[in-house]
């Protein structure tokens, strides 16, 4: 998979979660912050990243940098996805179903951020199992990675799109 150059895209950032993490040492607790950020151009490109630092803004900056390195392309048909798919990560699972125009994004918290920034405006989703933000984001990305356009599937099978769709 080729890397996507973040400088050529107009990316929008969304902070999904900020977590205060404590390391207990002899003198007390050492506090740090971890941030989970999703970036996307609302036109088929989306990425996520995590960052850790002593201060919240610095953690967010690191997360945005990381997210720009992990961009991926999402196949979009009209305003939705080409087919139903199930994404897994750890104990988290998400079902993504295409929806008719005008339905909107029906998704919970972290998954909604990913889908909206990917540019999908009509989709149904259901998250099952772990609902930790990082697990939901990674499961959503797993689902989006599995998506294929009809043209790609037809090419792999050596058929035309018409033959494939019957």
From Swiss-Prot:
Ranges of residues in domain S5 DRBM: 11-74
InterPro entries: Ribosomal_Su5_D2-typ_SF, Ribosomal_uS5, Ribosomal_uS5_bac-type, Ribosomal_uS5_C, Ribosomal_uS5_N, Ribosomal_uS5_N_CS, Ribsml_uS5_D2-typ_fold_subgr
Superkingdom of the organism of origin: Bacteria
Keywords on record: Ribonucleoprotein, Ribosomal protein, RNA-binding, rRNA-binding
GO cellular component entries: small ribosomal subunit
Pfam families in the cross-refs: Ribosomal_S5, Ribosomal_S5_C
Single GO BP term: translation
Entry's Gene Ontology molecular function annotations: rRNA binding; structural constituent of ribosome
HAMAP family: Ribosomal_uS5_B
Subunit and partners: Part of the 30S ribosomal subunit. Contacts proteins S4 and S8.
Family: Belongs to the universal ribosomal protein uS5 family.
Free-text note regarding domains: The N-terminal domain interacts with the head of the 30S subunit; the C-terminal domain interacts with the body and contacts protein S4. The interaction surface between S4 and S5 is involved in control of translational fidelity.
Known role: With S4 and S12 plays an important role in translational accuracy.
Name of the featured protein: Small ribosomal subunit protein uS5
Naturally occurring in which organism (per UniProt): Geobacillus thermodenitrificans (strain NG80-2)
Upper classification of the organism: Bacteria, Bacillati, Bacillota, Bacilli, Bacillales
């Amino acid at each position: 998979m080729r890397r996507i150059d973040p400088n050529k895209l107009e990316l929008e950032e969304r902070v999904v979660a900020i977590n205060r993490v404590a390391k207990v040492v002899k003198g007390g607790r050492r506090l740090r912050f971890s941030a989970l950020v999703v970036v996307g151009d609302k036109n088929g490109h989306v990425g996520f990243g995590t960052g850790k630092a002593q201060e919240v803004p610095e953690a967010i900056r690191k997360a945005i940098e990381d997210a720009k390195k992990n961009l991926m392309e999402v196949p979009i048909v009209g305003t939705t996805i080409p087919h139903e798919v199930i994404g897994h990560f750890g104990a988290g699972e998400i079902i993504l179903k295409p929806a008719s125009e005008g339905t909107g994004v029906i998704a919970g918290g972290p998954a909604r951020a990913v889908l909206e920034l990917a540019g999908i405006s009509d989709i149904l989703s259901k998250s099952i199992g772990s609902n930790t933000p990082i697990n939901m984001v990674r499961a959503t990305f797993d689902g989006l990675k599995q998506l294929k356009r009809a043209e790609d599937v037809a090419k792999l099978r050596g058929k035309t799109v018409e033959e494939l769709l019957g």
